[in-house]
Amino acid sequence: MGKKQVCPPRALPPVPSFCSADDIPLSRPKKRKPKGKTPLDDIVQATVRRQSESSEPLTPEPQDVPPQRKRKKKKVPPDSETSFTQQNTASLFQNGNGVDVPEAEETVVRKQRKRTKKARPAETHSSNELEVEEDDIIEDEHRRSPDQQPVFAAPTGISQPVSKVFVEKNRRFQAADRAELIKTTENINVLLDVKSSWTTRDVALSVHRSFRVIGLFTHGFLAGYAVWNIVVIYILAGNQLTTVSNLLQQYKMLAYPAQSLFYLLLSISTVSAFDRIDLAKASVALRGFLTLDPAALASFLYFTALILSLSQQMTCDRINLYTPPSENGSIWTAGMEEEILQPWIVVNLVVSILVGASWIFLSYRPELDHSEELMFHTEIEEFPQDEREMLKSQ
């Protein structure tokens, strides 16, 4: 019992009996593998190869390969099964599908892939044509060879302008010449009706300008009317005022209408003359009088004539109510007519001279208007320097 029991040596397994050639299926000749590689390395290389193929850019789907028939595996005895599986692992993973494909079929698939890659530039070119506008016009230099163009691509040509253009008229498209159409469109001037907003300053300037035009006609008419009035008075009064009674009898019907019209025209002319000077600034108005400005002189003469004509209004009332001194209720006494009418005739003569002189001064420079200039000046000061130049140019 003290001695250790020695185990008998391990017996080798029985050598399998070699079967006949009919029982063992024929297999492809075994490829030599490089030293230092194991089946696991082959599996890793196959998986990396499949990932690289999947990472390639998308290409059009290859043509469908007809399904391949699976080869029936014959049953192999258990002792030869291990060696057979080791031989076929590399071929199974090389296909990636687990299907053993012969070499001839593998070359066909590779050729089909190369053909599909040739059609790839044509598809990318067509997508670029839709995105880039500069490539829409194809020149002769950039034309591709017929081998590179896709089979089913539409024919492309050089884009050139057509001489005729189709224009829609009365719900129908009619052909028209491009040159004539361009000429007609250039000759049409489209005027936009822009309604500018009026301010109080614009209204004041428009009224001022319109009243200045009316004043010009009034000045001329008043000068002519004053000359006519004084001529009629002297004709009716006679030489050295010998026929004063004749003047009173003939002129009493014209005293009120003539003097009223004269006063109206004189007042309009006076206001129009004062509108041409700036009375808001006394220094400017005084400087105009001292420098003999035509507008300042005309306004002064009109104002003087207006005061003189108003001073003789009572005499005009007495002329209108004239009755011979011999009649009862007459306000005229015998021998006093000449003394009353002589100052009235002289005043009318002076007024006529003043009105005529004012008209001459204003007609010398009718566009002279200091009020309008000052109003524009204050308006321009509100704008910056750039806008001032624009307004002056207008």
From Swiss-Prot:
The keyword Membrane applies. Residues 80-97 have a biased composition (Polar residues). Its main location: membrane. Residues 110-119 have a biased composition (Basic residues). Pfam families: TMEM237. GO terms for biological process: cilium assembly; regulation of Wnt signaling pathway. The chain crosses the membrane at residues 213-233, 254-274, 288-308, 344-364. One of its GO terms (cellular component) is ciliary transition zone. Belongs to the TMEM237 family. This is Transmembrane protein 237. It comes from Gallus gallus (Chicken).
